Amino acid sequence: MQDIIRKTRNRVWSRSYRAPHMYNDSTEEVASVFDEPTKSLIYSRFANPTVMAVEDKIAELEGGVGAMCTTSGQAATLLSILNICKAGDSFISTTEIYGGTVNLFSFTLKKLGIECIFVDANASDEEIDKAFQPNTKAVFGETIANPALTVLDISRFADIA
């Protein structure tokens, strides 16, 4: 994929690609995308040079090996939990989160067999510790929380975990 992006980057700034469809040299090249998705670009919903440039820059700035951009915070939240938890797992979330996320955690993930245990961010250390189960895989919180604008004490939760 880097070669594809590199072809578009011989300028001071990255070009913005607004077209949903990408040009390919042959139908064989297009067909190969479905066998090996990193080989070529076909349609911007799968990948496009603009998003890939942003992902590369974020990874570089953060010192990471990669990054993933999503079209919404809900998509990012869902993907983060699904990459850590599977059916039968649980995770802890503070109650001070966006209402749509409460719905995602309480209903959607429950249908997939993933349990969310909600705790108040201001609960005692003992109450938070008690929420952890043997199958707890993650802790989720927002900072600055929506809509309360509270700041989560991440280090406190990390110490308890």
Q: What is each model feature region?
A:
Residues N83-T101, D120:
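Conserved PLP-anchoring active-site segment centered on the Schiff-base-forming lysine
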Residues I58, A76, F91, V139-E142, ...:
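Buried hydrophobic positions in well-ordered alpha/beta secondary-structure cores of metabolic enzymes
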Residues K86, F132-V139:
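Short acidic/histidine-rich motifs immediately flanking catalytic phosphotransfer sites
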Residues F107-T108, L112-A123:
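A glycine-rich helix N-cap at a beta->alpha junction
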Residues Y98-G99, D125, I144-L149:
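Short, small-residue-enriched loops and turns at beta-alpha junctions
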Residues A145-A161:
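Active-site core of PLP-dependent enzymes with the aminotransferase class I/II
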Residues M1-T38:
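N-terminal glycine-rich, Lys/His-bearing helix-loop that initiates the first secondary-structure elements
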Residues D25-L78, G100-L109:
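Conserved N-terminal alpha-helix of the aminotransferase class I/II PLP-enzyme fold
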